[in-house]
């Protein structure tokens, strides 16, 4: 299987070079489950796209500092590509910004959250049991780092997970699109660098709590397994 990573950002954080760029982070976490997966990187932030849609079996849109409702030309071009992938029922995964821009591109709405920043390790509840993540319960923990949120899902989307602070935390569209607001790719030390960099924006209390939660266990490998099962169906 080949997954095309539609990279929407560049890592420029001080002290973060050891973690690489987002495509490398995603490759590492997917290879932890299936070392045979191939990856192709497309810098959509610089208008780089596959020549043909079927160049890859599935695509994944990364996180980004940009807003899904931005009028930047590359953001609008990415929305157009999402619509093409949807029309062709090409497998597509969205993570954080990817989750948001897929919702925006297909008729949903993304806005700055009235609840402010959502940061740290947090739990999200699974609503649709056909997407069980483990045999024990219907909650899982992921790293979060976002201020925008999906406030309205696309008309044909099915909500499968959420929480009080992130109601539209995960959704599917038919059998070819799966999106999650939580991160699967971020190392906890890298997340700490993000929170350090954004401390003033986040606020002292939320920053302190977010850093404290980074000692909690996370379920990114369980989520990666579900994503792979989804794209391989």
What are these regions (language model features)?
Residues 46-50, 118-119, 151, 167-168:
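A short acidic, often aromatic-flanked loop/helix-cap motif at beta-alpha or helix-coil junctions
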Residues 2-8, 12, 87, 126-233:
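Amide-donor transfer/coupling interface in amidating biosynthetic enzymes
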Residues 38-40, 109, 141, 158:
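Conserved beta-strand segments of alpha/beta enzyme cores
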Residues 42-44, 113, 145, 162:
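Conserved beta-strand termini and adjacent loop/short-helix elements that scaffold enzyme active sites
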Residues 1-73, 77-80, 84-88, 208-233:
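N-terminal beta1-alpha1 cap of cysteine-dependent amidohydrolase-like domains
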Residues 18-21, 54-56, 73-76, 107-110, ...:
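Short, glycine/charged-enriched secondary-structure capping and boundary segments
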Residues 62-130:
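Cysteine-nucleophile active-site neighborhood
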Residues 15-16, 51, 70-71, 103-105, ...:
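Short glycine-/acidic-enriched loop or helix-start segments at secondary-structure transitions
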């Amino acid at each position: 299987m080949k997954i095309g990573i539609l990279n929407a950002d560049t890592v420029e954080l001080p002290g973060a070079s050891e973690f690489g760029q987002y495509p490398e982070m995603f490759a590492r976490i997917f290879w932890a489950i299936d070392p045979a997966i191939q990856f192709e990187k497309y810098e959509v932030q610089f208008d780089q796209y596959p020549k043909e849609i079927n160049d890859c079996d599935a695509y994944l849109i990364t996180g980004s500092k940009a807003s899904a409702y931005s009028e930047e030309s590359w953001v609008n071009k990415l929305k157009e590509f999402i619509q093409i992938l949807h029309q062709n029922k090409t497998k597509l995964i969205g993570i954080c910004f990817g989750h948001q821009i897929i919702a925006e591109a297909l008729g949903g709405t993304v806005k700055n959250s009235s609840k402010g920043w959502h940061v740290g390790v947090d739990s999200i509840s699974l609503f649709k049991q056909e997407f069980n993540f483990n045999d024990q319960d219907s909650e899982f923990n992921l790293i979060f780092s976002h201020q925008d949120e999906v406030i309205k899902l696309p008309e044909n989307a099915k909500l499968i997970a959420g929480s009080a602070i992130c109601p539209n935390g995960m959704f599917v569209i038919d059998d070819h699109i799966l999106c999650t607001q939580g991160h699967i790719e971020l190392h906890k030390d890298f997340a700490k660098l993000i929170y350090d960099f954004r401390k003033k924006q986040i606020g002292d209390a939320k920053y302190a709590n977010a850093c404290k939660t980074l000692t909690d266990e996370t379920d990114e490998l369980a989520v990666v397994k579900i994503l792979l099962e989804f794209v391989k169906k």
